[in-house]
Amino acid sequence: MNKLRFLISLHGNQNDFQVAQAQCAEATARKLGINAEIVLAEDDPVNQSTQLLKAIQSQKESRPNAIVLEPVGGTALPQVAKAANAAGIGWAVLNRHPEYLAELRRQGRVPVFAVSADHEEIGRIQGRQFAALLPRGGSVLYIEGPTRSSSAQKRTAGMQETIPSNIQVSMLKGNWTAESATRAVSSWLKLSTSRSAQIALVAAQDDAMAMGARQAFQQVADDQERARWLSLPFTGCDGQPASGQVWVRDKLLAATIYLPLLTGIAMEILVAAIRDGTQPQEHSCTTPVSVPALDALVAQRS
């Protein structure tokens, strides 16, 4: 069999999880002995669609055997998926479980499946972290991912399942990047309501946004006010060994949630499916883990 060629389509390189996803894809390609081309959509769903269609519509000898896609927009590019399927290109979706997968799988030509983090459970863990860090209750400033993101919506829903009634949450919107969170928090700080909010914890749906929030508070002009904000616990999510876990050890974050990288998992499933001529399980989830463990957080605050 000729060396397999995979196209890996990711959001961009503006947060640590996306960078780690790309690095994981490169390492997995070396391990599996396949070629992997990584393309970055620069957080633009139209750009992502155009990049993928160009590859799908290229000469047969230069087409990828499979595409691994982490969708930027609210949909997982159903028309592009159909074009890939018609061209005999495998299709793996990361962090979504789109409805169109079942239809494409019934056609049975190539592997079609999804691998995602368990976003509801991520949210539930965040809610439990809040309870551990604020045993007497209080107010949380919570930075969500973009409105279009089902991952963000599910994390929020999970968090709301597990926070106790003595914790109130004020929500801001970010775009998974440090810069977006810095802008959101800086704008919020200009509102009179920010001064009366009595925030006791700052949380974000990823580590990059949590660190971006810290950056906004570092820019507060008043020394006493700045020190008060920076003394609060900050929590995030992604928990990669080279970023989020380091920030926890350095006490820049009080907690994060470790998420296994998805690109390598999807690539391994694709290689096995292509070589064995099988159709993988339609959807599988990875397991998130609190860092530090929840009982350790409780012990820190008791």
Labelled PLM ranges:
Residues 79-121, 241-246:
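Flexible loop/hinge segments that line or gate small-molecule binding clefts
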Residues 17-32, 51, 122-126, 150-167, ...:
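Short, solvent-exposed amphipathic alpha-helices that sit
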Residues 30-45, 139-142, 160-182, 231-232:
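Short beta-strand elements in bilobed, periplasmic/extracellular small-molecule ligand-binding domains
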Residues 52-67, 194-200:
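Short acidic/histidine-rich motifs immediately flanking catalytic phosphotransfer sites
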Residues 69-87, 159, 170, 174-246:
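Hydrophobic alpha-helical
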Residues 48, 52, 113-140, 181, ...:
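Hydrophobic alpha-helical segments within soluble ligand-binding/sensing domains
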Residues 2-4, 143, 151, 162-163, ...:
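Hinge/cleft segment of the Venus flytrap/periplasmic-binding protein
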Residues 5-24, 28, 36-53, 70-75, ...:
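Extracytoplasmic "Venus flytrap"
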